[in-house]
Amino acid sequence: MNQLKNLVLDEKDSVKKALNLIEKNGLGSCFVTSGNVFKTVITDGDIRKLVIKKKNLNLSIKNFFNKKKGIALNINTPEIEIYKKLSDKTKIIPLIDENKNILSYSTIKNLKKINLYDINLEGNEFNYVSDCLKTNWISSIGKYVELFEKKFRNFFNYKLSLTTSSGTTALHLALQVLDIKRGDEVIVPNLTFASPINSIIMSGAKPVIVDIDEKTYNIDANEIKKKITKRTKAIICVHLYGQACNLEELLKIKKKNQIFLIEDCAEALGTKYKGKYVGNFGDISTFSFYGNKTITTGEGGMLVTSNKKFYDKAKILRAHGMNPKKRYWHDLVGFNYRMTNLQAAVGLAQMEKANIIIKKKIQIANYYNFEIDKLNKEIKEKIIVPQANKNIVNSYWLYNVRIKDIDYNLRDKILNFLEIKGINGRTFFYPLSEMKIYKKYSN
């Protein structure tokens, strides 16, 4: 009840007392009761109107607000229903019991927000990490690294898998394994996070930015054909927001031009293309386990391939280029791109419930689709939701909605409305071609 100390007063109390209470609680409102029974909510705005009218604030609240109706909800009301009632006008709602006694209150700030992604750490994460700490295996050597790699490849039917320190280092490692260097060109989509293009630049090669397909937001196979040159060495296809690229067409381009295909699956763990998990189509594929990804290790990544030579080279490069049979003897100029045993312990625990996490994301997306479909025609004609494809099972890393017309004002209004309702939203990635540092790689 301490939280209600500066919020509740009786209808017999003066308006001046209510004003003092509102100034003290900083919430812009207070709750009015009659013999402990909830009556109404009055705001600083209500009192301001009385001041303008030069009313006597020493009179009781009952004199002015006896007929004012206030919103109150039962203490057991689900949060989603409370969110629906909160707005710019109704910023605070008292929560009452069956006898209309005030027990608590809700505001947008004290309700749990609906985040873009909430990490599920309710499995064996704590137990496995504790095991690492108890046994002192906290660096890049330890049983959990191999256990995580094995669990990952078996679940998604990958032949070979190698943990890395991040999704970005996995991409850079892939380019190094394929011997991509200065003078080579690597094709990359225009709409993506910067990791792929940065990895290409760090490899010394030239990125070639290619436009996207308007329906999927993934790299457009027809546009790739226009950008292929004698110097093209590889394509990095990014399965954006959980939607798979047109892999059938990409594989045709790869075969015809004798180039490599790297799948960036950072946002598409669990996505399927023609019955197979993405990551099974490229020469090398990479994943990210950053904190907002479908499964997480805090920071971390994975490189997968079916090519034993690529795998062996990646493993050496990942550990400083050191000969695995002759310690401290370096065969290659390598990197420290290893994942720690601690991170892998979290990853293993995450993989134990990967199926549940993926299914839940798809269920939530289906719910969004169902509810959006019920909107009136005028609204639906202004937006584009993720496009269904019979060949693809979208894992919906992030559910996305695009406004058809270029209307930044409407976009910002929607984001602001979501924020008021306690729902976290964000804009799409910026096109690479719009950023000064990458502009020269786009025609």
Question: Each predicted region: which residue ranges?
Answer:
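Bateman (tandem CBS) regulatory domains
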Residues: 1-7, 13-14, 57-70, 132
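The conserved cystathionine-beta-synthase
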Residues: 7-27, 33-34, 51, 71-91, ...
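Short hydrophobic beta-strand motif reused across regulatory alpha/beta modules
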Residues: 40-45, 103-109
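N-terminal "arm"/small-domain region of PLP-dependent enzymes with the aminotransferase-like
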Residues: 108-136
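Generic structural signal for small/hydrophobic residues in well-ordered secondary structure
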Residues: 129, 152, 170, 186, ...
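Phosphate-binding glycine-rich loop
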Residues: 143-185, 199-203, 209-211, 276
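PLP-dependent aminotransferase class I/II
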Residues: 148-150, 159, 222, 226, ...
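Active-site phosphate-binding strand-loop segment of PLP-dependent enzymes
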Residues: 215-297, 302-304, 308-309, 410
